[in-house]
Regions:
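Catalytic Tyr-X3-Lys loop
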Residues: 82, 89-108, 123, 127, ...
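Amphipathic alpha-helical dimer-interface segment in Rossmann-like NAD(P)H-dependent oxidoreductases
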Residues: 70, 102-120, 160-161
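Active-site loop of short-chain dehydrogenase/reductase
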Residues: 7, 73, 87, 118-131, ...
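C-terminal helical subdomain
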Residues: 165-173, 189-225
Length: 225
């Protein structure tokens, strides 16, 4: 198991299926958590795992940046996001704005919130969750989703290249399939065809503990089939 004792990690999307698994894994590894989420989902997360602080914030709002800057963290794990499909010829500007806001703007605001402290202490890690479609650079029936998740990957990798000399690293996580969640099971997906969220959480914790000269900048995580 990864050892994250003495580390403070900000986890966004608290209460979601993946974030719940990540939160438990990080706590088990000894990390202190700052949970960021909204409403009932955030409350569920607060009830399930101990957290140093709990922030009910809308990360699509630029005002969230200043609130996040009040908190000193060693790593950011960003799981906020949305999925959507539509025929390319039926997509609207609102569809584009909504998808980019959910997947890219929220990440940008979270990063802008935590980055000043990371740069000051000359150490930090930013983990962003992308998608299989972005890894393949193709998503039939989900062009806007694919583009927004590709933006996530490009942003995090660019941050890594720009800031690694200042102690701040980046890692992109690509779930190369659906994650095992109640929603996906209700949709008829079988457990063996989906990714174990706790296993994915363990992979993220592993990435967070890599030494400076052995970075993991991209993780592709697959189900069994």
């Amino acid at each position: 198991m990864a050892n994250l004792s003495g580390t403070t990690i900000m986890l966004t999307g608290a209460g979601g299926a993946l974030a719940t698994a990540v939160a438990q894994e990080l706590v088990d590894a000894g990390a202190e958590l700052i949970l960021v989420g909204r409403g009932e989902s955030l409350k569920r997360a607060e009830d399930r795992v101990p957290a140093t602080e709990v922030l009910d914030l809308d990360l699509s709002d630029p005002a969230s940046i200043e609130e996040l800057r009040r908190h000193k963290v060693d790593a950011l794990v960003h799981t906020v996001g949305a999925y959507g499909m539509q025929d390319a010829h039926k997509a609207t500007p609102d569809d584009l704005n909504g998808m980019m806001t959910a997947n890219m703007t929220t990440l940008f605001h979270a990063v802008q919130g935590v980055l000043p402290h990371m740069l000051k202490q000359k150490e930090g890690m930013i983990v962003g969750v992308s998608a299989a479609q972005a890894a393949r650079m193709s998503g039939k029936g989900a062009a806007l989703y694919t583009a927004s998740k590709a933006a996530v990957a490009a942003y995090v990798l660019s941050l890594h290249d720009e800031l690694k000399g200042k102690g701040v690293r980046g890692c992109v996580v690509y779930p190369m399939g659906a994650i095992d969640t109640p929603t996906n099971r209700e949709a008829g997906m079988t457990w063996e065809a989906t990714i174990d969220p706790r296993g994915m959480a363990q992979s993220i914790a592993h990435a967070l503990t890599r030494p400076p000269r052995a970075h993991l900048t991209e993780l592709k995580i697959y189900p069994d089939v």
